[in-house]
Every structure is written in C-alpha cells, then in structure tokens.
C-alpha cells in the first residue's frame, strides 16, 4: 500500500488486455507473484504465461523421488525475512522420507519444494485465481505503449508491462549436429522420467558432471543398475559435497576493481583450505551475499574474462552436491562401475542394432546402450527471438543474453532501458553474477516487486 492508503498500480500507461504479464511459470515467476501479493499489489491486472503448473518449472517439476534438492531445507528460501519457512513446512507436511535426513541437514526431494510453493499460492486466493495461459511465448513485439505476445498455440495476447521469468531453457545436445530424442537418447533428463526406459544392464554414457549428472547416477544406483556408467566432462571433476557450514557473515567487496582484483579478493577470502572443508564453504558463502552488486560494478569486458576463465569452476563450487547423490557417485567410483573421462562429446551415431557410438574430441569412441545429456541448460528461443528482431539489445560479452540494467530492465537497441520489460531469475545471471538459487532469486523477486508497485 502507498502511505496515503492507495493501492499501488501495476498497469502502467498502456491500455492492453493485461496490465502485467509474467512470461514463465516456474519458481522465478511464483516468487515474484508471492512478493507482489505480499506488498498488497492488485492482482486483477496480472496474467501468467507458461506451460507448467505455477512454481514447478525445470528445477522442481520432477516425478523422480531420487532427484533431491542440493541444499539443506533452511537454505531453500522464498521469504528472505523468514529463512526457516520451508524447513518448518517440510517438518509438518512431509512424512516417511527416511533418506532426507543427513549429518549436515535435511535434503528433501525437488518435488517437495514444488508442493511447498503450491501451498503458498493456494493460501493466497488472489494468486490461486490468476489467469494462467498454459502455453509458451514465442515472440514479443512493441504495440503502442505496450507489447504483443505471440504464443506457440497460434494465439496472441498483450500487456502493458512484461517480466521475463523464463527460467532455464531445456538442454540441447552439446554438439553441432542435433539428433532425435529416443528412450535411450535422453536430451532433457530434468523431469526424471527416463530411468524406466533403461535396461538394468545397459552401458550408459552420461554427458556432463554437474548436479544433473549426479542425480542420474543416484537414481541409477537406487534402481540397482548393474551396467557400466561412463561420465564424460571437459574438466573431469565432480562437484564437492555440501557441508554443515553455519554463520557465514556477509563480506563487503572492494570498490572499483578489475577482473584481477575481483579474483584476488575471492582467493584471499577462501585461502588455501581444501574446498571439501566446512570452513572453505563458509567463507565462500560469505562472498555470495554481495557478489551481485560487486559483479555489476565490473565492466563488461572483465565480466566476460572471468566467465570464460573461471565460470566453470565457480559453478562447481557454487552448486555443491547433496550428500545422497554425492554418496552414490563415490560408491560407484569405488566399485569401478562408474568411470570418469576427461573429454568432450562431439557427436553420436546409432547403429542398426540400436547401439550408440559416442565420438569424443580426442578421437576416442565409446559404445553405449543409452546416453543421458546432463550438459546443462540450452538457449532460450524467446530471448533469441527478441534479440534477433531488435526488441532488446545484446549483452556486450554474452551475446545470446540481453543487455540489462542493475534494476533488471532490458535495454533497447538504442542503449536506453525499457521502462516496461524486465527479467528475473536464471536469464539474468550474466548481469547479476549469481542469481540461480532459490534464496537469491527470492531476494531478486522482493526487489523487483518493490519497483513494480511504485
């Protein structure tokens, strides 16, 4: 509410079918809506566009109980001022999950967090009854003071203001010549419905070594898979396991540094402690509190330099594995069932007998009965479209992402910020530095909600 008692407006200047349209229906969209509602914003002018149930998205729309959150419950936060909210909800509403509790905290199933977000939405009638168009946006174009939005079902709608909350786009195969999806060529493994199509003795190649790869290994072990598993990744490294770190105080980053000073501050902070240690993670988490502001003070060239040289290492340190998945990987490594190959997959061909021939950059080849693509998110076709048609300018160093202001407004081709097009969540990570986890997206949602209701 405004101080004079008036409700804030979300409609902007344009007169179109929707005052505010949130494009995307995953966690980022849900977090923004929850924070808008918490600020008393009227919901009668808000529309959501997205194919999935609100709050599920790629991260939490799982059907596989082996796919778990990679952080303990109290770090999964939609309400920054009440960090234990999900943990308290889970303690009351989740029963019979004997695998959740570990020595360093409770790591619930990914789908449990989706259930929690759904319960938060149901508790707010204005959100539960929001218009939700179950489609995907494929193009956005200017229309007077607002926007026309084309959908993949052939229909269209409009809005005065747009927030792009498109999340992580589905993966593509990490080589030039794309191949068709089949039950044994799993391009998008995030939902977790593929293991039932894999024979227990199948030779499996897993592409990538991050959290999705560990999810795949964990569910295969749980299903008593006895075939060999080969993991192929350029760095040949698995992420470290989560520790029981506590009391990470926010550090103030130095002002006006270049890439070298940015990196030096990080190295000096974590010191020479092995990254497996609890103290190393505590220090690392201290860096993350204000990294977004520090990152935005770097010029684009320095941002690009750091991303090219150290982005992969930051991701490994940032996205540590939950104890359950990490334990499964270590078990299979110890028994020799899992092998890690430091290489890159360059292509896959399939014989008439259904065997997949996996080519590697070194010239080596692997034979597999199934290939699971855990190489990470692909490129967002909607973002690509609005960059190609000039609706938004390209980022200087990450050219497949939009240029954005520190207040999350997309920038026009002429260099001026849009006053009615914003972004939130993973699609902003290149400008915000580290906005991918639930807590950091929640903080971002809180700030954007405050600006939208002004």
Residue ranges and their predicted role:
Residues 50-96:
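Redox-cofactor-proximal catalytic regions of oxidoreductases
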């Amino acid at each position: 509410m405004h101080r004079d008692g008036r409700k804030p407006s979300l409609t902007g200047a344009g007169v179109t079918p929707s005052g505010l349209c949130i494009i995307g229906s995953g966690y980022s969209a849900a977090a923004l809506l929850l924070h808008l509602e918490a600020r008393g914003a009227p919901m009668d002018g808000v529309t959501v566009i997205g194919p999935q149930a609100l709050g599920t998205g790629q991260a939490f729309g799982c059907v596989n109980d082996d796919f778990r959150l990679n952080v303990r419950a109290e770090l999964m936060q939609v309400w920054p001022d009440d960090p234990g909210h999900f943990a308290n909800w889970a303690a009351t509403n989740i029963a019979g999950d004997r695998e959740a509790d570990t020595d360093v905290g409770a790591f619930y199933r990914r789908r449990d967090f989706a259930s929690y977000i759904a319960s938060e939405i149901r508790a707010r009638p204005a959100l539960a009854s929001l218009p939700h168009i179950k489609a995907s946006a494929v193009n956005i174009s200017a229309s007077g003071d607002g926007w026309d939005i084309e959908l993949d079902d052939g229909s269209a709608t409009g809005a005065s203001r747009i927030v792009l909350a498109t999340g992580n786009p589905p993966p593509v195969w990490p080589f030039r010549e794309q191949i068709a999806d089949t039950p044994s060529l799993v391009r998008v493994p995030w939902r977790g419905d593929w293991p039932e199509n894999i024979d227990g003795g199948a030779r499996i190649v897993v592409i990538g070594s991050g959290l999705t790869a560990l999810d795949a290994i964990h569910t295969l072990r749980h299903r008593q898979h006895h075939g060999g598993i080969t993991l192929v990744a350029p760095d040949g490294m698995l992420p470290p396991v989560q520790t029981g770190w506590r009391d990470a105080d926010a550090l103030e980053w130095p002002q006006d540094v270049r890439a070298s000073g940015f990196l030096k501050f990080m190295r000096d902070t974590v010191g020479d402690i092995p990254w497996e240690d609890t103290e190393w993670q505590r220090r690392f988490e201290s860096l993350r509190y204000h990294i977004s502001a520090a990152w935005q003070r770097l010029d684009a060239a320095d941002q690009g330099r750091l991303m090219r040289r150290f982005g992969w290492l930051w991701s490994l340190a940032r996205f540590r594995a939950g104890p359950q998945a990490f334990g499964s990987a270590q078990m299979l490594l110890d028994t020799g069932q899992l092998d890690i190959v430091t290489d890159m997959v360059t292509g896959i061909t399939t014989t008439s007998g259904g065997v997949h021939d996996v080519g590697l950059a070194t010239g080596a080849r692997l034979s597999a009965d199934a290939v699971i693509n855990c190489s990470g998110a692909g490129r967002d076709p909607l973002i690509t479209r609005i960059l190609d048609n000039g609706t938004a300018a390209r980022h200087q160093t990450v050219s497949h992402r939009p240029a954005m202001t520190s207040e999350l407004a997309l920038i026009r081709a002429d260099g001026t910020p849009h006053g009615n097009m914003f972004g939130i969540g993973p699609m902003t990570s290149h400008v915000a530095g580290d906005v991918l986890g639930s807590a950091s997206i929640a903080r971002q949602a809180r700030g954007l909600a405050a600006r939208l209701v002004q």
